Amino acid sequence: MNFKKFTAIAVVGLSLVAALIGCSDQKKDDNTLTVGFDQDFPPFGYVDENGEFTGFDIEMAKECADRMGMEIKLQPIDWNSKDLELSSGSIDCIWNGFTMNGREDKYTWTDAYMDNSQVFVVKADSGIKTHADLAGKYVTAQADSAALNALNGEEFTELKESFKELLTCSQYNTAFMDLDAGSVDAIAMDIGVAKFQMEGRESEFVILEEPIVEEQYGVGFLLGNTELRDEVQATLEEMVKDGTFKKISEKWFGYDVCTIEVEDEE
């Protein structure tokens, strides 16, 4: 290889390395908050009859971004790929009924803003009343969901092993169709989503009284991204203080779901 050709290649190589280093150190310099969410997770995030993204968390995120002086980009994601979306920088946060419990060390979190529980939904005429009645039954849960993670945990080994099979689904709309058709006997899922899906069909489906696990929702950021987390946390606290959080909660749930504690202003 002649010297000139070698030098040219070396310069290009060094330029690429410098560019990559620059990219890795580059802070987010645009003014957009890109929110990753599952668009099939009502009432937290979903597509309405007009084809628009809506939901409790969507409305909260929009209000938060507006107060922070940022444009918001709502980015639907495959829930099973959420970590890749976050680590690649495709999204800034996951804000969509995102369970903190068991994931505390994987993300940088806001304070928990809402309590939640994972439950089983069955057909009303199935005869299934308790967890014990699920023995020999087909149970489904969304891939990489908190419900699936709970059932795969040591605490629920005996229960899981009693199932005929623990299946996974990509979205809960599909799960309810499978339940209605008899392809599965129970769905493990978030109680808020279950209640939304069951609206107008309470005679067809029931939620078992005993929950799988109690948990909390938070907004999750890439581990170490405390700067953006702190901005969002402070804005959420403002929304609690001025009553906006309560107003949005009551619109979607009929009551105030907020669990963020703020000091009373003197």
Please report, for each region that a protein language model flagged, where it lies by residue:
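Short, low-complexity disordered leader/linker segments with a strong preference
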Residues: 1-32, 258-266
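Short glycine-rich His-centered loop
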Residues: 32-55
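Periplasmic-binding protein-like
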Residues: 39, 115-122, 191, 195, ...
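Ligand-binding cleft/hinge of the Venus flytrap
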Residues: 47, 61-69, 147-168, 198-202
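Short helix-initiation/N-cap motifs at beta->coil->alpha
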Residues: 58, 73-84, 165-181, 215
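Extended ligand-binding regions for polar small-molecule ligands
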Residues: 58-67, 128, 132-133, 137-138, ...
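Acidic, polar ligand-binding/catalytic clefts
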Residues: 62, 66, 71-133
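A ligand-binding cleft/hinge motif common to bilobed small-molecule-binding domains
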Residues: 97-106, 152-153, 178-214
